[in-house]
Amino acid sequence: MSGSHKTAKRKEDEMSEIIKAILFGIVEGITEWLPVSSTGHLILVGNVLKPGLSDAFMEMFNVVIQLGAIMAVVVLYFHKLNPFSPKKTQKQKLLTWQMWIKVLIACVPAAVVGLLFDDILDKIFYKPLPVAVMLIVYGVLFIIVENRNEGRKPAVRRISELDIKMLLWIGAFQMLALIPGTSRSGATIV
């Protein structure tokens, strides 16, 4: 193969990888806002598209691509999330701090399990079959829970109504989301 053909082939491969990255971005952009696992969908799309990249790079890519969604939330809800906002009253600032404390408490169970078992979970569950199974299981669970709760009023309407026991239960369900194919918001909803 001549030098110009190699260069053309390399450019074609690079363009193909760019298109794959755009497709990953579209999948992330859509699934991050729904009660489905965006990480699970990225794993499945990666299995279909088979980007010519190392597993370590794809792991990092899947984390970095989610930063866009995180930044969108921060920008969209900055006033609500910021306890230092000069536009807030003292009471609003206090409520914002209380919200952050409750978020941290709810994160404890998943953080502990994630730190202790991350490598094991990665080896077992970061594969297309377990991801697909979890997506199906949670899809069925959502339908069951939705039908069971139809017409019921929510037990909690405000963050201020959450006590430590309920926060730890939320955190326990967040542990389920350590398994790809399990939505963080979906696990909390169930």
Regions found by a protein language model. Give the residues of each.
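Multi-pass membrane proteins that catalyze or facilitate reactions on polyprenyl-/lipid-phosphate substrates
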Residues: S2-V190
